[in-house]
Every structure is written in C-alpha cells, then in structure tokens.
C-alpha cells in the first residue's frame, strides 16, 4: 500500500512486521496478556502502537451508525477472508489491512441528522441505505461489488477512545492483495 495525500487528509503507509489482535471481555486480563506478549517478543519486536478498542452500543461506530452491514456472510465470508486450500502453504491465511482512524466528533456533532445520514449514506435509526445518497457518502465509496474486480473482504471496525478523542480501528481480511489494490 502506498500512502495517499489530499488537500485535507493524509493516509500514510505504515507497514509492520507483526500485528497482534487480542480479544476478550476483561480489560485487565487483556492488559496483562499484552504485557506478557510484549515481554516475550521484546528481543525481536518493539511495539509501535497499542490500541484499546471496544464494542460500542451493540456493534455501532462512535457516530451511532451500525457497522459491518455489508459484510459477506457464511461461505462468502470465508471465501473473501481466507486463502483457499488449493493455494498450498498459504492456505487458511489472510492478508490484512489495518487502519487507525480518528473521528472529528465535534464536526460530526455539529451536522444536522440529515447531513450525518448523507455523510454515511444510511439512515441511522433504520440502518436503511439511502436511495439518493451523494457520491461522497461512505456507502458509495466502499461498495465492494462496484470495484473491478469485485473487492470483497471481511471487515471489522472497533471503536477506540483515549481521553476525549476517539475513532475506529478498521480491519479488513482478504484472500489476496487484489481487494486492497482496487
């Protein structure tokens, strides 16, 4: 992945050698497990970022919108996320992209509900995709079936907060690099 820069944003490329995802209900247990792993890996690896993420409001982003509604399910999810068995040594593995996003909550909160819905392309309360969503809407820019070739991945977002700042960690698992290059 090559970094991207625009007039109002910068998305740097930050490749890493190792990524760990620890999950659990007890934050204290996760902290201790993380500390043990960091100590075990310390001779070879130095942590670049540790993010404490969580489930918010039954799977919603901090903006209040339901997350992951367009994820493939069942066999389609397995096919999107994992290298197929016939691939040999890589069978069962995934290519992963991780993005750490910081939300501008004051800016989003200053929008009307209609403006927020248009920004996402869904109605927050019903989770229905808007027929007249603008091309700049999140759902229009991320429709996996609209890429050539189709760019299906299994996506997972995890809200994070530190002090008064927050956002999401976006994780995408793919069976090849193709979806990430679309």
Predicted regions and their residues:
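Long, histidine/aromatic-enriched segments associated with O2/redox biology
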Residues: 1-182
